[in-house]
Regions:
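Hydrophobic/aromatic-lined pockets within catalytic cores
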Residues: 55, 108-111, 209, 213
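Catalytic cores of large soluble enzymes that bind and process phosphate-bearing ligands
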Residues: 42, 95, 249
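P-loop NTPase motor core
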Residues: 2-66
Length: 280
């Protein structure tokens, strides 16, 4: 499975559809200004801005208040303590559910009985209402606006279409705010065409798959016109204990084709296999 397909599947609860990367590339050919916006949204600076936004949400997203059910009451101050102390390590939009489970256990212990399905739903709705919103699409749109970018179209779920430039930032926001499925059972991930992966994609790969990860690529074959030096920033994400193997001997083409291609790409350190053909 490609990383794009994985991302689209993980975002199904946020948007019903996402733009394909090749559609974005075609769009950028006729709208060159769009290309710069794509790289801006994949950058470390953009990610740092999002981290600042996540910290702001810890307070701005919450409306914590007293909870009462029949003769049972838990004060807002107690809920605040649970939310910001006991369960602080849980991502923000999953944290109140942990508080709810704690309160349900407390109530059932005091009442000497289990809550029925209808009561469980009531507890859930009341505690989820302490969030101003849990909609990742809305939260990301607000973030874009806060950093001076155009917000996403304000439409119902069924009409949402996420541009490719926003796919991985939205996925990062979701994984930062929700307790998502871990992938610790996966022991090996192979990344092909490594030259086409952005900073934020590598950050997500590192976060999702803490396993061995061979990265394969060809710096002379990027999808995008703007090239990035992946090897320069990878140690900042994966640490300096990485091993680089450069294979610069070409077996696929005749010397005439390879020399012509190297002139176009500016590659000078390629070792050519001595096999001749027609002049180019």
């Amino acid at each position: 499975m490609s990383f794009d397909l994985f991302a689209y599947r993980e975002l199904k609860d946020v948007v019903p559809d996402c733009e394909d990367r090749y559609d974005m590339i075609e769009r950028n050919l006729v709208q060159p200004k769009e290309r710069g916006r794509y790289w801006e949204k994949q950058s470390p600076d953009f990610l740092n801005q999002m981290e600042g936004y996540l910290m702001e949400l810890e307070d701005s997203l919450m409306d914590i208040r007293d909870f009462t059910y029949r003769n049972y009451e838990i004060k807002a101050s107690r809920i605040l303590l649970l939310f910001y102390t006991r369960f602080l390590e849980i991502p923000l939009l999953s944290r109140m559910d942990a508080v709810r489970e704690y309160v349900v256990d407390d109530y059932e212990t005091l009442a000497g009985r289990d809550l029925n399905e209808e009561e469980q739903q009531y507890f859930y709705e009341q505690f989820m209402a302490m969030y101003e919103t849990r909609d990742i699409y809305v939260l990301y749109s607000r973030f874009l606006e806060s950093v001076g970018m155009c917000p996403l179209p304000s439409v119902w779920y069924e009409k949402r279409l996420l541009r490719y430039e926003d796919v991985y930032p939205v996925l990062y926001l979701k994984y930062s705010l929700f307790r998502c499925k871990n992938h610790h059972g996966i022991k090996h991930v192979v990344v092909d065409e490594m030259q086409d992966y952005s900073w934020i994609q590598y950050v997500l790969l590192r976060k999702l798959f803490p396993c061995r990860m061979p990265l394969l690529g060809d710096m002379a074959q990027p999808l995008e016109e703007q090239q990035q030096d992946v090897l320069k920033f990878l140690p900042k994400i994966f640490g300096r204990d990485i091993r680089k193997i450069v294979m610069n001997r070409s077996y696929r083409n005749t010397m005439e084709i390879a020399e012509y291609a190297n002139k176009l790409t500016g590659i000078q350190d390629m070792e050519l296999f001595e096999r001749h053909g027609e002049p180019v």
